[in-house]
Structures are given as C-alpha cells and as structure tokens.
Amino acid sequence: MESHNTLNLDMEKDQEKAFDYSKRAQWLRAAVLGANDGLVSTASLMMGVGAVKQNVKIMILTGFAGLVAGACSMAIGEFVSVYSQYDIEVAQMKRETGGEIEKEKLPSPTQAAAASALAFSLGAMVPLLAAAFVKEYKVRIGAIVAAVTLALVMFGWLGAVLGKAPVVKSSLRVLVGGWLAMAITYGFTKLIGSHSHMYV
C-alpha cells in the first residue's frame, strides 16, 4: 500500500514537472516569436524608408517609431488576449471547485503584456543598432541585412528547438520569410517613391 502511494506521488511530481516545462516552453516560444516579429517589421520599415530617403536620422527615427508602436500594439493585444483566457479559467475554476480560485495557476495578463512588449523591443533593436553607427547608405543597408539575417537564423533555431521541429527547415523558413518581407517592402516603396517624383 505504501509503495503504491509513493508511486502515485512520484507520478504526480513527474506530471507537475512536465506541466511546468510545457508552460515555460510556451512562454519562451512566444518570446521568440515576439522578438522575430519586432526584428522583421522594424527592419522592413527601415528598409522601406531607406528606399526613398537615404538619411540615417530618418531611418533611425522611423525604426524607433516602429519599435514603440509595435511594442505597444503587442502589449495591448497580449493583455486583452490573456485577460480573456483569465476570465474563462476563473469561471471554469468556480464551476469545478464551488467558488475557490487558485490564483497561482492563472495566467497573468500584465506579465504577458510586459513580456510581449519586451520581446518585440529586443528584436526591433537589432536593425536599429546595426544602422545607428553607419553613415554610408549602401554599407548601412548591408549592415541591416547582415544583422537581421544572423538574428533570423538564431530565432529560427530557437523556435525549432522549443517547438521540437526540424532545425534546418525551421531556420530556413524564418530566414526566407524575413528576407521576403524586407525585399517586398523595399521594392514597393522604391516603386511608389519613383512614381511620386513624376507628379511633384
């Protein structure tokens, strides 16, 4: 009987550990995705502006505005999303336990919002830092592409490890997606910019 109880306790501990690891992996994966979003959107924005305005200050200010706007948007979106999940879980706990709520098991909307904004900001800092200290336009564009490429590969690898997906395929998918976003933004802005000069 005693050995049976010990076995049950060990199984419960293993389940708790697996649950904790799963929650941690979800948070880390969300952080990687947020950072990747900040990286690609800010770099694409800077590349787009750089297609028509070669001034370093304009590129940096545009990137910084993208960082602030994106971080705020991510934080608000995550807060609303997690708060909805929080309300659902509270209602479910009340039904199951007759009114008792275990707050430590509930998601924190504030923490989720802060983590999302921070992850986005960290990703967005990569192209900003790459461009900040380069005055020559072509070298600056090259520095942004190189820095973003390295970061995309790293984020792709991290996402694959956390999601237990094939590393090479995942990294290539993230890399190609980032390159496409930058190339499309640059190309369209360049096209519109060149046509707008004809009517000025």
From Swiss-Prot:
It comes from the Eukaryota. The chain crosses the membrane at residues 32-52, 60-80, 114-134, 141-161, 174-194. GO terms for molecular function: manganese ion transmembrane transporter activity. Residues 53-59, 135-140, 195-200 are vacuolar. Keywords: Ion transport, Iron, Iron transport, Membrane, Transmembrane, Transmembrane helix, Transport, Vacuole. Induction: Induced by iron supply. It catalyses: Fe(2+)(in) = Fe(2+)(out). Coiled coil: none annotated. InterPro entries: Ccc1_fam. Residues 1-31, 81-113, 162-173 are cytoplasmic. The keyword Transmembrane applies. Disruption phenotype: No visible phenotype under normal growth condition, but decreased accumulation of iron in the root and increased accumulation in the shoot when grown under high iron concentration. Its main location: membrane. Probable vacuolar iron transporter that may be involved in the regulation of iron distribution throughout the plant. Belongs to the CCC1 family. This is Vacuolar iron transporter homolog 3. The lineage of its organism: Eukaryota, Viridiplantae, Streptophyta, Embryophyta, Tracheophyta.
